[in-house]
Amino acid sequence: MIPTMNPEDLRAKLIRNFNDAKFEMSDRVPLYDGVQSARLASGTAAEKMGASIDIVPPGKRACPYHFHYVEEEMFIVLEGEGTLRVAGEMLPIRAGDTIFIPPGPEYPHQILNTSGKPLKYLSLSVNAETEICEYPDSNKYLAVSRKKGPMLDGRRMHRVKDDLDYWDGEA
């Protein structure tokens, strides 16, 4: 038997309208300030999917150049024009373009607004239980675990400085 739920609760768990989304403003000066982002999947029944609407002002970037080891991403350009920096290339993007980014070091990526008007797009991703991202421009990496552990509780960003031996610090 299928469990029943009242329609309002069911709608709240399953449906988001990005026209009603609450945006947060970034203040990361100078390249990322003014970027607006609204997370859509938060509070829904989705456990392995992420979605957001992002609005990037002219001359700004949505996030640093990076790649994922596990998660795939898709971006759907809703309004405006810009540039997809990917795999060492600069590719023009415009409203209607759908961008598919597989995981792996072959596809580091970043979306830049190189136009004179706002760039608005929908971001979709799988949310892996654990993930590692690398940031080639700044020589750092991000470790993410959606499971809580004694050492890794959420997100940890580190710069690659030392290459430690496997046994370093062990008794």
Roles of regions detected by a PLM:
Residues 103-131:
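Ligand-binding loop in jelly-roll beta-barrel domains
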Residues 53-58, 68-86, 124-128:
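Short, conserved beta-strand element in jelly-roll/cupin
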Residues 34-39, 52-68, 106:
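Conserved short histidine dyad/triad with adjacent acidic residue
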Residues 1-48, 134-171:
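A short, N-terminal "cap"/entry segment at the start of jelly-roll beta-barrel domains
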Residues 80, 96, 111:
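Short hydrophobic/aromatic patches on the structural cores and recognition surfaces of FHA
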